[in-house]
UniProtKB/Swiss-Prot annotation:
It is an enzyme of class 7 (translocase). It is a multi-pass membrane protein. InterPro entries: NqrB/RnfD (IPR004338), RnfD_bac (IPR011303). Its main location: membrane. Keywords: Cell inner membrane, Cell membrane, Electron transport, Flavoprotein, FMN, Membrane, Phosphoprotein, Translocase, Transmembrane, Transmembrane helix, Transport. Belongs to the NqrB/RnfD family. The complex is composed of six subunits: RnfA, RnfB, RnfC, RnfD, RnfE and RnfG. This is Ion-translocating oxidoreductase complex subunit D. The lineage of its organism: Bacteria, Pseudomonadati, Pseudomonadota, Gammaproteobacteria, Vibrionales. Its cofactor is FMN. It comes from Vibrio parahaemolyticus serotype O3:K6 (strain RIMD 2210633). GO terms for biological process: electron transport chain; transmembrane transport. It holds the Pfam family NQR2_RnfD_RnfE.
Length: 348
């Protein structure tokens, strides 16, 4: 009997990079749907515009590098980067926010390091941090959930607000936001931190209208939706469970310990798990195969480090949510983590 001898690498999976990226996008749809339902059409508009900008930038960079743009576009990595950035920014952010962010994500954080598979840091999180530091007002001005708004801002007005700064009645973005919020409102994490710093107790802070049964209204269901999508990715073996498990276990442990030590200053573990970008970060951002750790032990440590950093930044940092900063700081530690968690070679 003759056997066919194939050359290496002897891959055990037939999934290609485009297939993996498609699955990531498909599994993010529940989270996108929840964000659109609770925060209006802005997130969906930002996503469509972001994909168009990301694809254009990817093609332009590949042409400048004298490489085939179609081959690069077929891997769908630019679409996933655009997706992660679009769902991370406030829905009513002006159009130029997404353009500047994607320039940093695609051109600098990705192609400056050599393109797909070569970047040291998560491109979407590099873009998010640059935007957050450079434009803090635009990046922290979230509107209230639609359930708290008497008159929802429709699709046409949302489109006009994003691209012109005014709705069809001539009201500016600031006027519209003041009309639906009463005050400029950030995320529940920001509201909780501000309330604690002003001397309120956690129960007093959580009695505000923006908070629901478990966490912030809308945000708890957005996180649950991303959790469902993440579990599907694990089931389909698109990602492995090590990084999300390390992330969520670490965040839960730290919030549980400090809620016992300082009960008047720390939110409960369930609040941390269902607030901000926790589930998006655990399943869709931290699991980036290029910038994350590569060993089994390393992935657990990598995820646990992110969870600890998220809790530290949320509790004592200058920003309400710390997922982006935590991921980038953990990316810096990947070479060290991989070096000390290398599996022993058989026979040595």
């Amino acid at each position: 009997m003759s056997f066919f001898i194939a050359s290496s690498p002897h891959a055990h999976s037939r999934r290609s990079t485009p297939d993996l990226m498609k699955w990531v996008a498909l599994c993010a749809i529940p989270g996108l749907a929840a964000q659109t339902y609770y925060f209006g059409w802005g997130t969906l508009i930002q996503l469509i515009f972001a994909i168009a900008v990301a694809v254009s930038l990817e093609a332009l960079v590949m042409i400048c590098r004298k490489r085939s743009p179609m081959r690069a576009l077929r891997d769908n990595s630019a679409i996933v980067t655009a997706w992660l950035l679009a769902v991370a920014i406030p829905p009513w952010s002006p159009w130029w926010i997404i353009v500047i962010g994607l320039i940093f994500a695609i051109v600098i954080a990705k192609h400056l390091y050599g393109g797909i598979g070569q970047n040291l840091f998560n491109p979407a999180m590099v873009a998010y941090v640059v935007l957050l530091i450079s434009f803090p007002v635009q990046m922290t001005s979230w509107s209230a959930p639609t359930l708290l708004i008497p008159d929802h801002v429709n699709f046409a007005d949302t489109l006009s607000l994003i691209f012109t700064g005014f709705d069809y009645d001539g009201l500016s973005l600031q006027q519209v936001r003041a009309g639906v919020d009463g005050v400029t409102m950030a995320t529940p994490l920001d509201a909780f931190k501000t309330g604690i710093h002003t001397g309120a107790t956690p129960s007093e802070v959580l009695s505000q209208p923006i908070f629901g049964g478990l966490a912030g209204i809308g945000w708890q269901w957005v996180n649950i939706a991303y959790l469902i999508g993440g579990l599907v990715m694990i089931k389909k073996r698109i990602i492995q469970w090590y990084i999300p498990a390390g992330f969520l276990a670490s965040l839960t442990l730290f919030s549980l310990i400090f809620s016992v030590i300082t009960p008047g200053e720390t939110a409960s573990p369930i609040f941390h798990l269902l607030s901000g970008a926790t589930m998006l970060g655990a399943f869709f951002i931290a699991t980036d195969p290029v910038s994350a750790s590569t060993t089994v032990k390393g992935r657990l440590i990598f995820g646990a480090l992110i969870g600890a950093l998220v809790f530290i930044i949320r509790s004592w940092g200058g920003f309400p949510d710390g997922v982006a900063f935590a991921v980038l700081l953990a990316n810096m530690c990947v070479p060290l983590i991989d070096y000390y968690t290398k599996p022993r070679t058989y026979g040595h």
